[in-house]
C-alpha cells in the first residue's frame, strides 16, 4: 500500500496534453489551522457586538500555550480566554493525553489598538462606499469548470478527506482518530484548449494523529475503506492508484505538541491548492477593510461568475490596491485560452457588473456578519454557504 513511486510515472502520461497536479489540505487540529480558527473566532466575537470592528488578530500556539497578538479597535467587550478555550474544545483537544487541553492551556493576550495612522487614511470621516483599502497588495481569484463548485478537484478531495476524518472522529466510528491530520491528492489531468479535465486520482496521502492502541495495518485499512472510498468518486480510483496512508508509521504526538502553529501559514490550503496564483496575504483574523481577505473573496466571486455564465471555462482574476485608496489600481483577467471573448471584452463585463471598492464589497458580500470561523478550515472557497460562492447573474 505504501510502495515506491515508479520512476516519474511516465507510463501514465503518455497521452498528449496529460499532466499531474497535487494539492494538500490540513485538518482542524493541525497547529496552523488551530491558530486560523482562533483568530477568526476572535474576529467573529467582535463582529457579533460591533459590526464595524477593525480587527487584525494573529495567534501562536505551542504545547500548553496560546498567544493572541495584533491590533483591534472595537466597541465590543470580548472574553478572549473564553473564545480561545471554546475554539480549542470544539476542535477536539480536550485532554492532556492528546498533547493539548483547552482547560489547562495558558492564554496570553497582547492586543493593541489599530494605528491611528491607518485609521485616518482608511475609514475615518468617510462614507462606507468610499472606505479605502487597509493596505497595498495584490489578490487573485480562480475558477475552473472541472467541478460543480468551480474548484480544482485536487483541493476539493483533499479538504473532503480531512472533513471525513473529523466526522468519523466526532461520531465515534473511528475512536482512535485525533484532531491533527494532513491529506494530499495527486490527480492526472488532460488539457482541452486551455481547460483541464481530471482523468484519475494518481496518489492519495493521509497522515492523521492517532491513539496508541491501534495497529498500523488497521489504520491503513480504515483510512482506505471508510475515508477514501467514502470521499473519492469510484470513477477516479483504479488498480494503479497509489496510497500512502500513515507513511511515517506513527503519529501519536500531534497538534501544538508536535509543531508550533501560527495564523496565516496555510494560504494555499485556504485558496486553490496551488492552482491559479496567490498574492501572499492571509485571511484569518482580518476584518473586511483588509483587502487581503475581502478582495480575494471578491475576485473569487468574479471568477466563478464568469465561469458559471459560460464566458470561459477557466479563469484567473487579479486585483491590486493601495492603502487608503478605494478603487482598485488594476483588474486583470486571464482565461488560459478558454473564452470566445477577448480578455479586454471580459474586463468590460467585469467593470459593468462588479464594484471592487472595499466598502462596496462588504455590502455585496455581507462581510460584517460573524461567519469567519467556519471559513478557517476546509477552504474558504467551493462551499455554497458563503456569499462569494453564489455566482452573480451578469449583464453583458
From Swiss-Prot:
Its EC number is 2.5.1.6. PROSITE patterns: ADOMET_SYNTHASE_1, ADOMET_SYNTHASE_2. The keyword Metal-binding applies. Disulfide bonds join 35-61. L-methionine binds at residues 71, 114, 259, 290. GO terms for cellular component: cytosol. PANTHER family: S-ADENOSYLMETHIONINE SYNTHETASE. This is S-adenosylmethionine synthase isoform type-1.
